[in-house]
Amino acid sequence: MLSRLAAHLVPFFGRLTVTADPGARIEPGTIIVANHTSLADPALVLAALRRRLGAEPVLLAAAGLWRVPGLGRALSRDGYVPVHRGTAHASAALDRAAVALASGRPVLLYAEGRIPPRSEASEAPPEEFRTGLARLAGATGATVVPVGQAGARRITSGGTVKQIAGVLTAPLRRPCLHVHIGAPLRLPEDVPAATALAHGAVTEAWRTAATALGESAAGTPVAAPPGPGRAGGVRRVRGRGRRRAGA
């Protein structure tokens, strides 16, 4: 339901365009990983995935959203997974995500684990990834689809007052927004290498999206994350078969 709602509401707040790599697809049990820049970007990504590929993924989101009246019930109804960051329950989100993947549902997560603490609305490359994505992919054998979004901070960013003002004025401004969907890939079993490679793939997808909006940050060199087997270790998925867990 929330994916459909996002698809209807996002055009009211901005002008969304979507591109995809050749062969981009969301198969059952796929992990989708996107860059996180704003409270608005989950709606952009959900709308883009539904528009371009007809996908309605389970979203891993901050547990605090479940305390918002009415929203928590809607999130639970769609099977979304609360993430209790910084607590002993944080790892439980990956267990629930694995169950969703096993049932054939795609799962959308944000490997940065937070919105960057910046006040300006301009774009910046994705921050360092946490290891949850690599561990989930390794445990389930799921393919990973990198997604880059740009423009969400034009809707809302910065402190509370600025965020509210951005949302209220967005329907008048209707900023340009762009989402780019990458081709599915397999991550190596080594967690640091897998994390670095996934970060690189999302960064490239983000760069494509930011370039589409004419963002100057798209041309900024990004330091290579540590870890062996950098870009050459990404295995793009050519067939439709899935790797079994532990393979």
Language-model segments: residues:
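A cross-family acyltransferase "interaction/gating" segment
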Residues: A121-D190
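Catalytic core of membrane glycerolipid acyltransferases/transacylases, capturing the structured
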Residues: E27-G86
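Acidic, Ser/Thr-rich low-complexity intrinsically disordered segments
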Residues: A223-A247
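Residue-level preference for the first positions of well-ordered beta-strands
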Residues: G29-I31, G104-Y110, V145
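Catalytic-site beta-strand/loop segments enriched in glycine and acidic/polar residues
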Residues: A100-A134
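Hydrophobic/aromatic ligand-binding patch that stacks against planar heteroaromatic rings
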Residues: A74, V99, R135-A137
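Helix-to-loop junction immediately C-terminal to a conserved catalytic motif
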Residues: L5-H36
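A conditional alpha-helix N-cap/helix-loop micro-motif detector
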Residues: T87-S91, P126-E127
